[in-house]
Amino acid sequence: MAAVPPENGVDGDDEREEEEEDEEEEEEEEEEENGDEAEEEPRLKYQRMGGNVPALLSNDAASCIAVAARMIALGTHDGTVRILDLLGNQVKEFRAHTAPVNDINFDTEGEYIGSCSDDGSVVINSLFTDDEKMKFDYHRPMKAISLDPDYTKKQSKRFVAGGLAGHLYMNSKKWFGNKDQVLHSGEGPIHSVKWRGSLIAWANDVGVKVYDTAKDQRVTFIEKPRGSPRPEALLPHLVWQDDTLLVIGWGTSVKIASIKSDQQQTGTFRQIQMSSLTQVDIVASFQTSYYISGIAPFGDSLVILAYIPIEGDGEKEFSSTTTLSRQGNAQRPEIRIVSWNNDELTMDALPVHGFEHYKAKDYSLAHAPFPGSSYAGGQWAAGDEPLYYIVSPKDVVIAKPRDAEDHINWLLQHGFHEKALAAVEASEGRTELIDKVGAGYLDHLIVERKYAEAASLCPKLLRGSASAWERWVFHFAQLRQLPVLVPYMPTDNPRLKDTVYEVALVALATNPSYHKELLSAVKSWPRSVYSALTVISAIEPQLNTSSMTDALKEALAELYVIDGQYQKAFSLYADLLKPEVFDFIEKYSLHEAIRGKVVQLMLLDCKRATVLFIQNRDLIPPSEVVPQLLKAGKNPQVLKAGKKCDSRYYLYLYLHALFEVSHDTGKDFHDMQVELYAEYDTKMLLPFLRSSQHYKLEKAYELCVKKDFLREQVFVLGRMGNAKQALAVIINKLGDIEEAVEFVSMQHDDDLWEELIKQCLNKPEMVGLLLEHTVGNLDPLYIVNMVPNGLEIPRLRDRLVKIVTDYRTETSLRHGCNDILKTDIVNLLVKCFNEARRGVCLSHEDDDSRAKREDNNRSSFSQRMVVDKSLSIKMTEVKSKTRGDTRCCMCFDPVSIRGDTVVVFFCCHAYHETCLMDAAFSNNNHKTTKGSSGYEYSYDNGVDEEEEDEEEDEDGDGDRPGRSRLRCILCTTAAAASAR
């Protein structure tokens, strides 16, 4: 049964707030009033007991109730005790009495039940043994009964009971039957009795007393609250919260008594437990504005069944003992949860059937706090929640603490979706409940138009459900709020359909405010989750429009990369001036694509761009680079970027780098380069003027004059042929006589020397410098003779001494050089002569066969007879000459290498080998004839004589007998004749 909102509010809180209104400021009062209007969450939930209860109470009326661990006992006005299960189904009944049942009580084990009635009887029934029943008649109406908690375990089978007679009986089983012991009497009827452990508490007209069965004596007395209604009209209520805390609700008063005792154990052979009361404290006491029809513990608070008196009726409410009120204007009973300080935590009005006609005593409250129940942090352990039974004549209402799911549902009903979500997460509820709360929370945020907050919660609420994600993506899209959801969309676990991601990206692209989010999504999302071409098609129409932001342009470039359109991507990256564009060019070999992005690349990194242009000058010639740089200031991308563009400086860097690589590639721009060097790098101007042949001299000269570049003027004038004017600049403006001398020396013009001397004669210092630097170029005496008489030349003596010294040094060096030259000439002539004396043996054998033959004969000597390439060439020339009419210089017969071996010398004289050998033999007195040849002959085939002699000495062959060198007979004879 759903809780019914209170009709009268919380009276206690209203009183406290009214007392504080005079002490607080107006703003605080308004906040408190607003707080009062907010509905508090109930602590309990209610439902009517079903089963057989409605049918039973339709013909009878309930009078009392008792609760055990596994069952419920309901007493009725017809004297029947009905045993019900926890769902209200009747399992057993005892027709124990003939009058209304006033009280029922179970033992702790729930095996026995005791009841008392106005017929004066007390009946004890066993719940599991049909024939075990005991009935005791006291002849006066009995109002209260309580079984020994250990009734099942103990043989004494004790119980206490009392009624209108005013006697409190303790009945126990003895050897000869049951016996009653009067524990107390003489203070009016016994209205209530409760037994816990060894303590028995009862209430009479005077107050509440406590009896200790272990010590067999009364231990305390608590006086009846003053002004309480008569007990016959409003019964006192006693509840043991635990073994030491007794809760008393009487009229409008609540007291909580703490009963403490010291236990000592003494004895020698056995232990005897002794109990001595030390203290009874009233730990809590307060008054209520309502009558107490029942009370029970609720964790560290109290549950009170409140009866709201009719205003102005006062004691009239209790003037009649009849059950039904003729007026029929009674208010609903209320369940209130209060702290021990009477701080009201919650209040629920109960829609009990026929409440308009009931009095306070017509209601009762029973609870089932069993041992083992735990209460911590406002929550009971699962299955240990206490149950509360509110009994009226025609109704039994069950109240129990609300669980986490009830709490969550209440929060959802009242719009506290965020708190509901937190509660679900804390309780780790069912998946269905989590989905329900999440969907409700998102719907609530959407209704409140808190789209960003709703989007941020989607990962937590939708978790791994792909269908839920897709549903909410399209829902956000319908609301045109999809851009706020995109940053939270999952790309893995779960992965959504490709269409979902494409719709999201297109939604971002159409709104300039979310272009940055689009860029972030394109960079972070895996390429495989969507089709880049679809998104590209949606973005491309925005190119060159006002909605095309830099972020959208970069996102489009990223999409081009994903789709493999690298040139388009490069174009956008270059326009965006992205530093990584250079690496992008190298990675994808986009050198041809840089043709139209010269300015952008120079703006990014002029040095790196210059290197790139130079390396690819075949693809991007200077004729394309220079015009773009000249128009850099008008480039729309440069203007949009707002960057400073020094186009002339970029031109200087490019043309300078180009000139260093190739002097002629950029020749069309050398005139411009002269201006750029003059502006940015004056040190390079003169080397450039000297190296280049493609600039206009007149224009260069005008620039040098304008900038006052003197040495550059000298060079340009010299190249223009104005040597005298250039010399004048050197002397008159530079004053550098050494440079003037160098300049004149390079011109190779004697008239220019005269001009130099003429311009220096009027300047004594210049004359002195001229004397110092003309040694080796001009005769110093000539200069001295031209000096006018009387001209004072500074440091003339020292300079003359230096001139003479330098002249002597120069003369000595020249003599030494001449001697060296003569020696070199003689040596070279000797070498030439030796070369001319060498002979070459020609025969029909090829060179390789001959070399092999000679190697076999003279292995050591053959290593020195290697014919190099130059010798082979010479031999070829000789062979060509001997193929004509050449004759032997000895026998004058024609020579031919086909039949005979021929020896040819470099003097072009040829001999038959036999003729030459005979002549050599006849001239050698130490050698024998050829027929008895024990000698060997060698030829001057390209080996220097002196070197060969040295080698022979080193090898030990110089003393070998029978070895002689063949020489040209004619040349040798001629040389001998000339020597004579």
UniProtKB/Swiss-Prot annotation:
PROSITE patterns: CHCR, WD_REPEATS_2
BP GO terms, sorted: endosomal vesicle fusion; gravitropism; protein targeting to vacuole
Region (Disordered): 1-42, 931-964
Residue spans of biased composition, Acidic residues class: 10-40, 942-957
Keywords: Protein transport, Repeat, Transport, WD repeat
Family from the record: Belongs to the VPS41 family.
Purpose: Required for vacuolar assembly and vacuolar traffic.
Assembly and interaction partners: Component of the homotypic fusion and vacuole protein sorting (HOPS) complex composed of the class C Vps core proteins VPS11, VCL1, VPS18 and VPS33, which in HOPS further associates with VPS39 and VPS41.
Protein name: Vacuolar protein sorting-associated protein 41 homolog
Source organism per UniProt: Arabidopsis thaliana (Mouse-ear cress)
Lineage: Eukaryota, Viridiplantae, Streptophyta, Embryophyta, Tracheophyta
Gene: VPS41
